């Protein structure tokens, strides 16, 4: 009996020591779990595009990381515009400062002039890490200016959306941005110019209810969450269980709201192809006049 007790204590002691030593040696983030299929992989398996090797889900990206994936030639617009906390909402200023520090952005969207395959485009990229990419006053102002500049200089617009909706800390000022940006989109369309939107995970709330669904060509990333209200809110309202693919990019494509679903690793080439087609059509239209 004494021998068994000694062995048990000895084993337990050594196991604790070994585990503690190994745990301190393993860097954080070495294993990652996909939020869609819940598969776990060594972080390098996700590759340069941060895509799950099992189901193809694209992990959420900061605006600057996505910009680096798209192009090396870009000039930022309106980097000096900063929200001033119009309602003096408790804790909002501190939240803004944290978001600015994490994302290196002044607001939840990056806008600027970019070159894709030597073609100039007005580019907008929303950042889900900046207060969930929420639509605030300055976000709306930057997006409106993006479309206005594109209209003035006859440029196509490519917009990557990622948002939790309107920013509650700005109240009605936030909601007004939906119509403001949509009006700028309509003026851009009336000028006969191309607008491509890429819906990424997540695109919800006031953004999907306005300018995100106004594009000439609507692309989505695989497995992206796209919808207005949350699943639980809808289920509680309609008293029904929603299907598993509800508010997914695949379901929206099936029902005609999305033109195509493009894996992230092929997205840049697809955008270049669409810009080439648009350029050819524009040349043909001018040539036929």
Swiss-Prot record:
Its EC number is 2.1.3.15. It comes from the Bacteria. Belongs to the AccD/PCCB family. Acetyl-CoA carboxylase is a heterohexamer composed of biotin carboxyl carrier protein (AccB), biotin carboxylase (AccC) and two subunits each of ACCase subunit alpha (AccA) and ACCase subunit beta (AccD). Its cofactor is Zn(2+). This is Acetyl-coenzyme A carboxylase carboxyl transferase subunit beta. One of its GO terms (cellular component) is acetyl-CoA carboxylase complex. Zn(2+) binds at residues 34, 37, 52, 55. It holds the Pfam family Carboxyl_trans. Binds 1 zinc ion per subunit. Component of the acetyl coenzyme A carboxylase (ACC) complex. Biotin carboxylase (BC) catalyzes the carboxylation of biotin on its carrier protein (BCCP) and then the CO(2) group is transferred by the transcarboxylase to acetyl-CoA to form malonyl-CoA. Gene3D superfamilies: 2-enoyl-CoA Hydratase, Chain A, domain 1. It is found in: Cytoplasm. Its main location: cytoplasm. It catalyses: N(6)-carboxybiotinyl-L-lysyl-[protein] + acetyl-CoA = N(6)-biotinyl-L-lysyl-[protein] + malonyl-CoA. The keyword Lipid biosynthesis applies.
């Amino acid at each position: 009996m004494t021998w068994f007790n000694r062995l048990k204590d000895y084993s337990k002691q050594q196991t604790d020591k070994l585990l503690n030593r190994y745990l301190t040696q393993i860097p954080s983030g070495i294993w990652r779990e996909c939020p869609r299929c819940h598969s776990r992989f060594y972080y390098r398996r996700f590759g340069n595009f941060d895509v799950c090797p099992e189901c193809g889900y694209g992990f959420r990206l900061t605006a600057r990381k996505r910009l680096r994936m798209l192009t090396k030639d870009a000039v930022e617009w309106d980097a000096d515009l900063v929200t001033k906390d119009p309602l003096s909402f408790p804790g909002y200023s501190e939240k803004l400062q944290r978001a600015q520090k994490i994302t290196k952005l002044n607001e939840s969207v990056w806008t600027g002039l970019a070159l894709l395959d030597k073609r100039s485009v007005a580019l907008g990229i929303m950042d889900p890490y900046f207060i969930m990419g929420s639509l605030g006053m300055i976000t709306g102002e930057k997006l409106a200016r993006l479309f206005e500049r594109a209209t003035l200089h006859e440029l196509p617009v490519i917009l990557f959306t990622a948002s939790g909706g309107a920013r509650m800390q700005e109240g009605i000022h936030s909601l007004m941005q939906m119509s403001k940006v949509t009006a700028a989109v309509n003026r851009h369309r009336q000028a006969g110019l191309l607008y491509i939107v890429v819906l990424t995970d997540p695109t919800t709330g006031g953004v999907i209810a306005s300018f995100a669904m106004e594009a000439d060509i609507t692309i989505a990333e695989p497995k992206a969450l796209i919808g207005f209200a949350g699943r639980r809110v809808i289920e509680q309202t309609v008293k029904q269980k929603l299907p598993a693919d509800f508010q997914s990019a695949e379901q929206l494509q099936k029902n005609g709201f999305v033109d195509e679903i493009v894996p992230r690793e092929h997205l840049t080439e697809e955008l270049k192809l669409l810009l080439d087609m648009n350029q050819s059509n524009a040349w043909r239209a001018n040539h036929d006049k």
